[in-house]
Amino acid sequence: MASPPPPPKLPVPGRRNILVTSALPYVNNVPHLGNIIGCVLSADVFARYCRLRGYNVIYICGTDEYGTATETKAMEEKCSPKEICDKYHAVHSEVYKWFDIKFDKFGRTSSPQQTEVCQAIFQKLMENNWLTENTMQQLYCDTCQRFLADRLVEGKCPTEGCNYEAARGDQCENCSKLLNPTELIDPKCKVCKNTPRVRDTDHLFLELPLLSDKLVNYINETSVAGMWSQNAIQATNAWLKEGLKPRCITRDLKWGVPVPHEKYKDKVFYVWFDAPIGYVSITASYTPDWEKWWKDPDNVELFQFMGKDNVPFHTVMFPSTLLGTGEKWTMMKTISVTEYLNYEAGKFSKSHGIGVFGNDAKDTNIPPEVWRYYLLTNRPEVSDTLFTWADLQAKLNSELLNNLGNFINRVLSFVAKPAGAGYDSIVPDAPNAESHPLTKALVEKTNKWVEQYLEAMEKVKLKQGLKSAMGISSDGNAYLQESQFWKLYKEDPAACAVVMKTSVGVVYLLACLLEPFMPSFSNEVLLQLNMTPEESLSFCDDKGEIAKAKRPWDFVSAGHKIGKPSPLFKELKDEEVESFRNKFAGSQAERSSKAQADAEAKKVADKLKGTKLSDGGQKKEQKKQSGGSKSKNAEVDVTVAKLDIRVGLIRKAQKHPDADSLYVEEIDVGEEAPRTVVSGLVKFIPLEEMQNRKVCVLCNLKPVAMRGIKSHAMVLAASNEDHTKVELVEPPESAAVGERVTFAGYSGEPEASLNAKSKTWEKLSADLHSNGELVACYKDVPFTTSAGVCKVKSIASGEIR
């Protein structure tokens, strides 16, 4: 029977009480390695360190679930926002569990506690007159018949020198500048791709200018006392320098905390206002006595971890909200901010699926302690850092395997050797350790490393803390080598006993110091020492255990029997690195599509095994039997490879000025300029669905005039049996514009222009159709791109023309 969970921890008078939070990961996707090191993992390391020191600490985190991004993702996946949240909350929980993240509470913001706490804070702000009503202009989509929240709009960033083409309505991903949707150049609705219009709507605003004196006093005092990281101070000062402006706290959405105000009952709170309150509400779901953590600033220290794009929300917005209530809140003392972790040649991107994601890391079979170590040695504390597979390989093989793992394995393996060659797994006695010169020199170095470790960790300089611990391992290896213990065993047994007992103590010390960074590694080392995690060294000030580091030979008693040594790390080979680099190239969507395309191509190949993969195989055989050599050559020439079918992007579509049934499209097919194409699709596909979408385009038909406008290609579409329903043949969303559509088993270059006399198109099109799985096919062979196969929406066994 499982033991009941421990009771919630509460602040204890007279002890150091620390509340650790990580920026709440947004729930609309799988976290990538940049997200993980930026907040969740960094906070976990610090919380574990606090436990190591004996501080009374809780670590609070959870998924941020309200807002536009959730609604958008729900639309993409054709489900409700709650279903999206349930799905991705479980995904996040599983990823963090695999990474050995130890939360005291991992909650979510779509909870009753969130509504209760958020609305209570709002009421206090209303009572204290820090909120004002105002009319603002917001983008409204006539096609979707809704106001567009920030993340439902994309356009060109207006910031000089940036001009990023896919800036979101709330923030530019490229330059990190916070935006209003109306500031975007050429904005588009993310749902239908149409251009929205500006329309008035009433909202509530937090009067940041009126709170500025209180806020500036808080920032000036706390940034010094709390040793804020320099990047946090710079980002905050940049905001203050621009001048604080009233900030809207409501949005025209359905998915969120309802505003408890009659006039605004159909609106919800804006996610920037709502999300940081999630730290409080998740604590409230951890313990009903949450106020003992959040309303006792004299007795609780709040440490917050996040990426640099989250800084203003935590140093300006959230503190202003709490200050405005007039209540005595536990305000942030220390903020630890990371820059960006970039991936190989570009940026990690959750929205674009680029990089290695949490589930990807698990699939590599590289253990979580290796991922934790690599991310933490590469933690972007003062500037952007770069993830590369070669660097991961170097750090694993050199630092973990050859340094740390080698030291521990050499020590324990020698102790485990049978008597006459070692100590038969029994730790020897070493009464004269203090007078052994080489050991005294090692202890002096170790003490300095421990002091540096503690100093760095207290200042939340995690990378330096890890470096200090690893320095002990390097010195331990040098100590072993210089001692020549393998000779001492025969020549000076007493000295050898000192070296080995001291080394076993250093192994134990390393297991304890590295626990915050690599907990599963530490547990394994303790297991090989035949010790439990409960026997781990505590660096509590009141227990005097820091001083014990000066006598490492005393850590493990003489006569203690160790466990069975085994290698702690496995070499990462060049061919594995190359395999991972190829496997994780491109975006997640492209990788998924490629895997699907490979699987479908294999399926087709298996089906056609034993047959000749050329057009008209049976006809060809029949012609051969009848001796018609001329006809045979003609058949060989009529192959689907003659068709130049490409992935096209409709840049613009409009009604033909002189024909009610025709559209005129401008389609990008990867050439210098878009092609003009005329299509008879008006009766079947609404105009708004023809905008900014990818299609399959036959590009080598002879241009033909249609009601006065020359068409230079043909959009491929499937129709049902009675031609009452027509659907476009759609390539995968991540397929490259201009990429040629291919057919497994049919190779060759397309004709520049199809020969009308030979009726090539007429012959080949007779075998173009959608199959029972809605895949577009030539005979039984799918239309294939590098990103996957092309499909139709719902028409099975339809003709494609």
UniProtKB/Swiss-Prot annotation:
It catalyses: tRNA(Met) + L-methionine + ATP = L-methionyl-tRNA(Met) + AMP + diphosphate. CDD domains: Anticodon_Ia_Met, MetRS_core, tRNA_bind_EMAP-II_like. A motif ('KMSKS' region) lies at residues 347-351. It is found in: Cytoplasm. InterPro entries: aa-tRNA-synth_I_CS (IPR001412), Anticodon_Met (IPR041872), Met-tRNA_ligase_1 (IPR023458), Met-tRNA_synth (IPR014758), Methionyl/Leucyl_tRNA_Synth (IPR015413), MetRS_core (IPR033911), MetRS_Zn (IPR029038), NA-bd_OB-fold (IPR012340). It holds the Pfam family tRNA_bind. It comes from the Eukaryota. A motif ('HIGH' region) lies at residues 25-35. Residues 606-633 are annotated as: Disordered. The keyword Lipid metabolism does not apply. Keywords: Aminoacyl-tRNA synthetase, ATP-binding, Cytoplasm, Ligase, Nucleotide-binding, Protein biosynthesis, RNA-binding, tRNA-binding. Residues 639-742 form the tRNA-binding domain. GO terms for biological process: methionyl-tRNA aminoacylation; post-embryonic development; reproductive structure development. This is Probable methionine--tRNA ligase.
